[in-house]
Amino acid sequence: MQLNKIKLALGFAAAATMAMPMVASAAADQEKAMSNANNWAHPRGQHDNQAYSKLTQVNKGNVKNLKAAWTFATGVNRGHEGSPLVIGNMMYVHTAFPNNVYALDLNNDQKIVWSYFPKQDPSVQAVLCCDNVNRGLGFGDGMIFLQQNDGQLVALDAKTGAKKWDVSNVDPKVGATNTNAPHVIKDKVLTGCSGAEFGVRCFMAAYNIADGSLAWKAMSTGPDSEVLIGADFNKENPLYSALSVYEDVNGGNKQGGSFKKIPTDQLQGGVADLGVKTWLKPQAVKDGWQHGGGSVWGWWPYDAKTNLVYYGTGNPSVWNPDVRPGDNKWSMTV
């Protein structure tokens, strides 16, 4: 596994090579809600993604006495991942495919205030990995954000459930899906991509919460310009940017030869476009990086002090490593 810190300026469309000022937060209501421990306004509680609650009513001394106070049946008998959101007296519940959303009034016997039922093509379930799950909802700027399994990112009015906007993030017809929870950070909503099992080239993307327009997209593989790698990338650890840990000794990069491991002290660091150059053998009619996987399905902590988002990419594609020798950057990377 390679360890690489990717710095993404959340207020801008491309990777920054210098300190950049942030725009004013459009999700001030999210920040206010998260400051109150009675709320759960982020899919993991806070931007640090630790899922830790400061509430003390339930503790190690009385947890054994907990009993169910009430239940709510979603009607979807598949894996339910991710917690509901709670903002004030409202609870927002999501389901596995077809990703229904319910807004419940906790002050009125959990009455359903509004509901949203996406119309998705059932065939998307055939390319979902690891059950038809959805990992949660996002909140900010008076909206609830849902990342549907079919790739549609949807913004719903938190009070009424009315759709404010939606945008297509991935295409299930090529094996790409979404199972992640949207993460709202300032004026952006971050989402990812799943599908490395099917040779999808995945990414992390940020959309403007005001209108759903794309702010930036960082691919998991490919040229530096598409991965959003800046000039100062891995400056302190250049060996993490080594060309390869293998040497092509018989034309394997294009013709199918043989490879041997390069001694650590002979690694060449600071090389550009490693997301292309470390895929040492083509698959079918394309170079491997063009369908190299690297799913991004969460979770993504944000550090407000440094303005950094940390995220990991998943396994390279295809599964068989014999047909994609090399480091396969930037899959399996932080």
Q: What are these regions, as identified by a protein language model?
A:
Residues L156, G161, C202-S213, D327-V334:
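Beta-propeller blade signature
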Residues V58-G61, L104, L156-D157, Y207:
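Hydrophobic/aromatic beta-strand positions that recur at structurally equivalent sites within the blades
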